[in-house]
Structures are given as C-alpha cells and as structure tokens.
C-alpha cells in the first residue's frame, strides 16, 4: 500500500461565500468515506484566496477512482458549483513522511 496525497488548488467563483463553500465541502464527506480509500482531508485558503484541498488516500488507485467519479456525484455538486474550474489544478504524489 502506497499512501497517496491528492493536492488540489483552486479559486472560488466571484461572489462565492467561503463559509458556504466550506460547508459544501464538508457535506462531501459521506461520498469520500464511501470510496473506502480516504485517510484524512484538510481544506485551507491563503490570504490571496487560493484554496488547497489536501486528501490522503490509501493508494494511487483509490485517489484516481474518487477523482474520476466526484464530478458526477450529487453530494459534490454544491461544492463544485462554487469553484472556478479553469483555476483548478490537481496532482497526486506518493507520501514519504506523515506525522500527526
């Protein structure tokens, strides 16, 4: 098993409310848990409005499977509707160190 980090950076659409977005992102948890591969998730935003969604997955396959299905899942629609699509960048990376 190779723990995989999924790092997605993006901006919200103009006028999108950060609190509403964070709630919509939290409402995706059942879907993410259903995948069976999510370990943990952190969502942050910097002072310039760049958001980072950082999810640890049990494997690269689990990460890619979830990424492929998230756009069609009804639980993800409110969250995805607030993201400026062209600003989004996703990458996956092998985790070499994890400290709690």
Spans of model-derived segments:
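Short, low-order "capping/linker" segments at domain edges
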Residues: 91-100
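Active-site-flanking beta-strand signature of metal-NTP-handling nucleotidyl enzymes
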Residues: 3-11, 52
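Short, glycine- and small/hydrophobic-rich beta-strand elements in well-ordered beta-sheets
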Residues: 26-52
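Short coil/turn motifs at secondary-structure junctions
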Residues: 13-15, 46, 58-62
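A generic structural micro-feature
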Residues: 2, 45-47, 84
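An amphipathic, aromatic/His-enriched active-site/gating alpha helix that lines ligand/cofactor pockets
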Residues: 32-39, 56-91
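Short, surface-exposed ligand-recognition loops at beta-strand->loop->(often short) alpha-helix junctions
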Residues: 11-23
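Short, solvent-exposed polar/charged micro-motifs at secondary-structure junctions
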Residues: 51-54, 99-100
């Amino acid at each position: 098993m190779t723990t995989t980090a999924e790092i997605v950076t993006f901006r919200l659409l103009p006028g999108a409310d950060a609190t509403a977005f964070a709630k919509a992102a939290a409402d995706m948890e059942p879907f993410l848990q259903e995948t069976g591969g999510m370990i943990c998730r952190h969502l942050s935003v910097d002072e310039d409005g760049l958001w980072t969604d950082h999810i640890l997955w049990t494997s690269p396959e689990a990460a890619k499977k979830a990424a492929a299905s998230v756009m069609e899942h009804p639980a993800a629609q409110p969250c995805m509707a607030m993201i400026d699509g062209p600003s989004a960048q996703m990458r996956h990376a092998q985790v070499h160190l994890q400290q709690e």
